[in-house]
Structure formats: structure tokens, C-alpha cells
Regions:
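Beta-hairpin "wing" of winged helix-turn-helix
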Residues: 92-103, 109
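Short, hydrophobic-biased segments on the C-terminal half of alpha helices
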Residues: 85-90
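Short capping segments at the starts of secondary-structure elements
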Residues: 45-47, 57-66
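Amphipathic alpha-helical dimerization/coiled-coil segments
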Residues: 115-134
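Short, locally clustered residues in the helix-turn-helix/winged-helix DNA-binding domain
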Residues: 54-60, 72, 122
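DNA-recognition alpha helix
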Residues: 65-76
Length: 134
């Protein structure tokens, strides 16, 4: 019998497992307090979608695996491949990304809705940072 009832639960389980893997690697490098480790996790792995959208806005349409490579080059984020695919799939289902077939390849590009959501998210982050500054 299948442990998961629907694809959303499978997605959550896969992301949870991969988040834990990524955090362990990052935590060993940083050696920070637990509070700071949680903050880093929340602002990177758990909000990976904003990084994916930024990469696609800067570099244009690309394959999911290339997104993974650019996440490392641009932000220094080592993200498991399955996590990138999961996030990209979720963003497509939400209309933030669009899947485009080019010959035998499938690339992803940001939709107009994706640009709007990215700008809203960035504005929210900037607002929070300005309120947190001393």
C-alpha cells in the first residue's frame, strides 16, 4: 500500500528529505548557532523558488539540471537535483514557470505571473530587512 495519498504529499516528502540533506552539509561548514542555522535554511532551501526564478530571469530559459548548476554558480547553493526538479514542477503547476519544448529538450522560462510574484517576494524581503535594521 502506498504511504502517500497524492502527488502533493510525495512532493512534500521528497523536499523534506532533501532539505535535511542540504542542511546537514551547510551546517557543518557554517558552525553557527541553531537559530542562525534555522534562519539560513528558511531563507535558502525552503524558499528555493525565488532563487530559481532569479536564475531564469538573469540567464533566460534553461533545463532543470542547468538551473541546478546556476544556483551553485550564482548563489553558492548546493541543491540536490531532485529538489530542483520538484521545485520547478511545482512552479509550473502554479503558473510561475512555463515548460517549453525545444526539439528533444524541455526548458523552463518565467511567466508574466512569475515576474510579478518574484517582485512581490523581493519587495516583502526588502521591507522585512529594512524593519530589522538598527
Amino acid at each position: 500500500m502506498c504511504k502517500y495519498r497524492n502527488s502533493s504529499e510525495i512532493y512534500k516528502a521528497v523536499v523534506y528529505i532533501n532539505i535535511q540533506t542540504t542542511i546537514k552539509i551547510r551546517v557543518k561548514v557554517l558552525e553557527n548557532s541553531k537559530a542562525l542555522k534555522r534562519l539560513i535554511r528558511k531563507l535558502t532551501v525552503e524558499t528555493l523558488w525565488i532563487y530559481v526564478v532569479k536564475v531564469l530571469m538573469v540567464y533566460g530559459p534553461m533545463k532543470a539540471y542547468d538551473i541546478k548548476k546556476k544556483l551553485y554558480e550564482f548563489f553558492g547553493l548546493k541543491v540536490p537535483t531532485i529538489t530542483v526538479y520538484s521545485v520547478v514542477y511545482k512552479l509550473c503547476s502554479e503558473g510561475i514557470l512555463e515548460q517549453v519544448k525545444t526539439g528533444s529538450d524541455v526548458v523552463y522560462k518565467v511567466t508574466d505571473k512569475g515576474v510579478v510574484e518574484y517582485r512581490k517576494a523581493l519587495g516583502f524581503i526588502e521591507d522585512i530587512v529594512s524593519k530589522l535594521r538598527l
